[in-house]
Every structure is written in structure tokens, then in C-alpha cells.
């Protein structure tokens, strides 16, 4: 009896600073976090400040598509 769409979905947060620097090939990698969000409470894309081990600072991590 599973519903068609679950309320909680798994999302991936990616560092926006590393993505911009990846074009110039300055960054050794791209930081990604896996988390969950409630689709009813947060219908828009999620953005959180998380620590990026490649930038060595707290940056904005935005939700990406799978």
C-alpha cells in the first residue's frame, strides 16, 4: 500500500563555490552532502550553509537534480 509520492525525498546538496571554480580547474573536487527534505514544507530548492572541505570554509550548498 505504498503511496505514489512520498512526502520525504532524498536530495543532494552541492557546493556552489566549487562548481564555479571547477570551470577554471582550481578546485580539487566538489563537496556534496546527502540529506532529506519534506516536499510539503519546502517545495522550492533548498540552500544551506555547510562546510566545504575543498574550499576550507562554510559556503552555500544548493540542491541539485539526481
Swiss-Prot record:
InterPro entries: Ribosomal_bL33, Ribosomal_bL33_CS, Ribosomal_bL33_sf, Ribosomal_zn-bd
Subcellular localization, as worded in the UniProt entry: Plastid, Chloroplast
Gene Ontology CC: chloroplast; ribonucleoprotein complex; ribosome
Keywords assigned by UniProt, alphabetized: Chloroplast, Plastid, Ribonucleoprotein, Ribosomal protein
Pfam families the record matches: Ribosomal_L33
Lineage, opening ranks: Eukaryota, Viridiplantae, Streptophyta, Embryophyta, Tracheophyta
GO biological process, one term: translation
UniProt record similarity statement: Belongs to the bacterial ribosomal protein bL33 family.
Keyword presence, Plastid: yes
HAMAP family hit by this protein: Ribosomal_bL33
Keyword Protease tagged: no
Annotated protein name in UniProt: Large ribosomal subunit protein bL33c
Gene assigned in the entry: rpl33
PROSITE patterns registered for this protein in UniProt: RIBOSOMAL_L33 (PS00582)
Example GO molecular function: structural constituent of ribosome
